[in-house]
């Protein structure tokens, strides 16, 4: 499973959307219907899964699926 596939799996589970809706340019709020609490829970799950801490400053910049992919790739994350 690639990093992108794992991210999409988490998004599908957390936001109860379909994998088809999870295109890189999809906005969590505008396209996937997430609210601020959903987004916070989603990013907490990402932190736990990928053993990375997302700073408050970085949280403000994550609005789309591609933002998460880019953020995690730069940090060379792995998961079990």
Curated annotation (Swiss-Prot):
Subcellular location: Cytoplasm
Family label: Belongs to the acyl carrier protein (ACP) family.
One cellular component term from this protein's GO annotations in UniProt: membrane
Pfam short name (any one): PP-binding
Coiled coil: none
Keywords: Cytoplasm, Fatty acid biosynthesis, Fatty acid metabolism, Lipid biosynthesis, Lipid metabolism, Phosphopantetheine, Phosphoprotein
Modified residues (O-(pantetheine 4'-phosphoryl)serine): 36
Gene3D superfamilies the record matches: ACP-like
NCBIfam families, sorted: acyl_carrier (TIGR00517), PRK00982.1-2 (NF002148), PRK00982.1-4 (NF002150)
Domain Carrier as annotated: residue spans: 1-76
GO biological processes: lipid A biosynthetic process
Key word Lipid metabolism present: yes
Pathway(s) annotated for this protein in UniProt: Lipid metabolism; fatty acid biosynthesis
Region forming the signal peptide: none
GO MF term list: acyl binding; acyl carrier activity
Function statement: Carrier of the growing fatty acid chain in fatty acid biosynthesis.
The protein, known as: Acyl carrier protein
Domain of life the protein comes from: Bacteria
PTM remark: 4'-phosphopantetheine is transferred from CoA to a specific serine of apo-ACP by AcpS. This modification is essential for activity because fatty acids are bound in thioester linkage to the sulfhydryl of the prosthetic group.
């Amino acid at each position: 499973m690639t990093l992108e596939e794992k991210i999409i799996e988490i998004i599908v589970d957390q936001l109860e959307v379909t994998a088809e809706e999870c295109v890189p340019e999809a906005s969590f709020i505008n396209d996937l219907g997430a609210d601020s609490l959903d987004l916070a829970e989603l990013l907490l799950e990402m932190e736990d899964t990928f053993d990375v801490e997302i700073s408050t400053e970085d949280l403000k910049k994550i609005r789309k699926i591609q933002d998460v992919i880019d953020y995690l790739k730069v940090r060379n994350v792995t998961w079990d």
